[in-house]
């Protein structure tokens, strides 16, 4: 098991929130952070601390993206026209592993990254094994025919915990999906509040 997967429960406890909306999240049982000092009362957080927390939460949600890669998303978000926070969310939601997760082909962002890495996904008929691949609106995403009967796929498509968002058209009979448009922050079904503008402020310091 990778360190990223081992750390997901720790992130929930550190944030005191169920980041992925999972029934087995440790914060469903306790609301304090990890470690022996997790129950201490916390004082008011500084602006820097608030921005850092927003960054850790958003970065962690997408499978704990590396800092180097997340900085690249920030750089691209401020380069694009429009609201930089909205741009950041759009770039993250266009990741191939994010689309695979949103389409309910697998149950978690961590599983989505591994699923793509192992070559189970095609984009416009071509196998792509890069989780960060940027999907464009209209691209056809499909699970390889030989991978459609994998247990993780069958279980994920039957999950009732979350729905496929409106900006993705998913056909679980054919195991295909399309991103119909780049979503705004308000459209993304985050289980907790995400504050991408605070992330932009963090990197803009």
From Swiss-Prot:
PROSITE patterns: RIBOSOMAL_S4, S4
Protein name as annotated: Small ribosomal subunit protein uS4
Family: Belongs to the universal ribosomal protein uS4 family.
Gene: rpsD
Gene Ontology CC annotations of this record: small ribosomal subunit
InterPro entries named in the record: Ribosomal_uS4, Ribosomal_uS4_bac-type, Ribosomal_uS4_CS, Ribosomal_uS4_N, S4_RNA-bd, S4_RNA-bd_sf
Keywords tagged on the record: Ribonucleoprotein, Ribosomal protein, RNA-binding, rRNA-binding
Species the sequence originates in: Methylobacterium radiotolerans (strain ATCC 27329 / DSM 1819 / JCM 2831 / NBRC 15690 / NCIMB 10815 / 0-1)
Keyword Coiled coil: no
Keyword Ribonucleoprotein: yes
A Pfam family recorded for this sequence: S4
Residue span, S4 RNA-binding domain: 94-155
GO biological process: one example: translation
GO terms, molecular function: rRNA binding; structural constituent of ribosome
Subunit structure: Part of the 30S ribosomal subunit. Contacts protein S5. The interaction surface between S4 and S5 is involved in control of translational fidelity.
Gene3D superfamilies for this protein: Ribosomal Protein S4 Delta 41, Chain A, domain 1, RNA-binding S4 domain
């Amino acid at each position: 098991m990778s360190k990223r997967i081992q750390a997901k429960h720790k992130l929930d406890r550190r944030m005191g929130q169920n980041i992925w909306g999972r029934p087995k999240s440790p914060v469903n049982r306790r609301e304090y952070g990890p470690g022996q000092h997790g129950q201490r009362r916390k004082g008011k957080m500084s602006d820097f601390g608030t921005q850092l927390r927003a960054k850790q939460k958003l970065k962690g949600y997408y499978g704990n993206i590396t800092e180097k890669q997340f900085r690249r998303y920030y750089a691209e978000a401020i380069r694009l026209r429009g609201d930089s926070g909205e741009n950041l969310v759009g770039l993250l939601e266009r990741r191939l592993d994010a689309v695979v997760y949103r389409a309910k082909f697998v149950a978690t962002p961590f599983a989505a990254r591994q699923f793509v890495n192992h070559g189970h996904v095609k984009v416009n008929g071509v196998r792509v094994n890069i989780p960060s691949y940027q999907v464009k609106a209209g691209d056809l995403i499909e699970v390889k025919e030989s991978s459609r009967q994998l247990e993780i796929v069958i279980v994920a498509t039957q999950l009732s915990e979350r729905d496929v968002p409106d900006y993705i058209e998913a056909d679980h009979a054919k195991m295909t999906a399309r991103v119909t448009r780049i979503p705004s922050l308000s459209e993304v079904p985050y289980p907790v509040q995400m504050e991408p503008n605070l992330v932009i402020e963090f990197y803009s310091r």
